[in-house]
Amino acid sequence: MGGASIWHWIVVGVIVMLLFGRGKVSELMGDVAKGIKAFKKGMADEDQPQAPVVAAPPVTATEPVRTLPPHPTEPAPATHATVDRKVV
C-alpha cells in the first residue's frame, strides 16, 4: 500500500487525460519545457560578468537656489475670541 506501482501511474494518467484532454496536456508539457529553458538561460546569464554601469555626470545648477523665508517663532494672533457656553 505504501508504494506506487506502475498500475497506479497508469490509472492517474488515464484520469488526467480524461479530465484535461490530450491537447491541454501537451500544452502544459510545452509550457513546462519553456520554463525550464528560461530558468537555465537565466542561470547562465547570472554567471557571465555584466558590463559596468556608467553613472551620469552631475547636473550643474544654472539658477541660484531659492530659500524660504525664516519661520516665525511667535504664533499668529487669534482673529476671534473663544466663548465658553453651556448647553442647556
Curated annotation (Swiss-Prot):
Task: Tell me which family the UniProt entry assigns to this protein.
Answer: Belongs to the TatA/E family.
Per the record, which residues fall in region Disordered?
62-88
Respond yes or no to whether keyword Transmembrane is given for this record: yes
Q: Which HAMAP family does its entry note? A: TatA_E
Q: What is this protein called?
A: Sec-independent protein translocase protein TatA
State the protein's purpose.
Part of the twin-arginine translocation (Tat) system that transports large folded proteins containing a characteristic twin-arginine motif in their signal peptide across membranes. TatA could form the protein-conducting channel of the Tat system.
Mind listing the UniProt keywords for this protein, alphabetically?
Cell inner membrane, Cell membrane, Membrane, Protein transport, Translocation, Transmembrane, Transmembrane helix, Transport
Naturally occurring in which organism (per UniProt): Methylobacterium sp. (strain 4-46)
Q: Which InterPro entries match?
A: TatA/B/E, TatA/E
